[in-house]
Design a protein with these regions (language model features):
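Short, solvent-exposed loop/turn elements at domain surfaces
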Residues: 1-2, 15, 30-33, 141-144
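Glycine-rich catalytic cores of cysteine/serine-nucleophile enzymes that process amide/ester linkages
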Residues: 1-24
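Secreted/periplasmic proteins
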Residues: 4-5, 32-33, 41-43
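Short, solvent-exposed aromatic-acidic interface loops
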Residues: 7-10, 28, 80-82
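Short, charged beta-turn/beta-strand-edge "cap" motif at the junction between a beta-strand
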Residues: 13, 28, 119-123
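Soluble "head" domains of membrane/secretory-pathway proteins
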Residues: 20, 29-32, 44-48
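Exported/periplasmic cell-wall-interacting domains
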Residues: 36-190
Length: 190
């Protein structure tokens, strides 16, 4: 599993949860703004071109992975600006740092499965038996209020069975900063 900071769809243009596949890999993509986005910009007094060619003005950056979900309208792509990663600012696509999308683009194949989830707490048991916990604010689709997260009962049971103090997991969950943190105590070698 690889973890990357991403930008996702803003409220009203949410990035949907999905299980899909990569339908297309496009280096140096062009961007054809959909009519809905063109209209949004027009209302702000900005006229978007019919097609934005590859290059420094293209908001998709240098790489795009088209997802097969729905009509294929969703992409995982780079960006041409140092803005939006870690935020809800896109029109539904998943925006990545240029170096991260370049790496991902080289690693994945057309037809590979992609799963988009919305889980505020994630737990990973690694092959070396280390455990990582990541927590972020739950995404809201309406009022923007924060929700106090609790340690899931399954994680509590696992922490007890593995004899791992829950204080570190609680701190990660309370912080809600989206950073995976190892919660297993260091191994003591004699």
């Amino acid at each position: 599993v690889h973890v990357f900071p991403v930008g996702i769809g803003r409220i009203g243009r949410d990035t949907p949860e999905m299980i899909t596949k990569i339908s297309q890999k496009r280096p140096n993509p062009t961007w054809t703004p959909p009519n809905s986005i063109r209209e949004e910009y027009r209302e702000k007094g900005i006229e978007l071109p019919q097609v934005v060619p590859a290059g420094p003005e293209n908001p998709l950056g240098d790489y795009a992975l088209r997802l097969a979900y729905g009509a294929g309208d969703y992409l995982i792509h780079g960006t041409n600006k140092d803005f939006g990663i870690g935020l809800r600012v896109s029109s539904g696509c998943i925006r990545m740092e240029p170096k991260d999308i370049e790496w991902l683009f080289e690693q994945v194949q057309r037809g590979e499965q992609v799963t988009i989830i919305n889980e505020p707490i994630k737990v990973s048991l690694e092959p070396d038996r280390s455990v990582f916990v990541e927590a972020h604010e739950p995404l809201t689709r309406s009022d923007g209020s924060k929700k106090l997260l609790q340690i899931p009962v399954e994680l509590k049971w696992w922490l007890q069975d593995a004899d791992i103090p829950s204080a570190k997991a609680k701190a990660v969950i309370f912080a809600q900063n989206g950073v995976p943190v190892e919660i297993t105590p260091p191994m003591i070698e004699f």
